[in-house]
């Protein structure tokens, strides 16, 4: 299941901060691409995204 895979990646990420940040980046990149229309978010959405990273 997808949720189990996400949980495993998240659990591993908690033990390895580097992997966690990679997973964090990929998750939000996919989230913004699929669920948040990048054209709608525009530069402001991306600025907030990069500030969080």
From Swiss-Prot:
Keywords recorded for this protein, A-Z: Membrane, Transmembrane, Transmembrane helix
Primary localization class, coarse: membrane
Transmembrane segments: 18-38
Keyword hit for Membrane: yes
GO cellular component, one term: membrane
Entry's localization field: Membrane
UniProt topology in membrane: Single-pass membrane protein
Descriptive protein name: Uncharacterized transmembrane protein DDB_G0288365
Organism: Dictyostelium discoideum (Social amoeba)
């Amino acid at each position: 299941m997808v949720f189990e895979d996400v949980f495993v990646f998240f659990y591993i990420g908690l033990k390895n901060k580097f992997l966690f940040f990679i997973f964090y980046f990929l998750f939000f990149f996919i989230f913004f691409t699929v669920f948040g229309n990048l054209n709608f978010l525009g530069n402001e959405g991306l600025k907030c995204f990069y500030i969080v990273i």
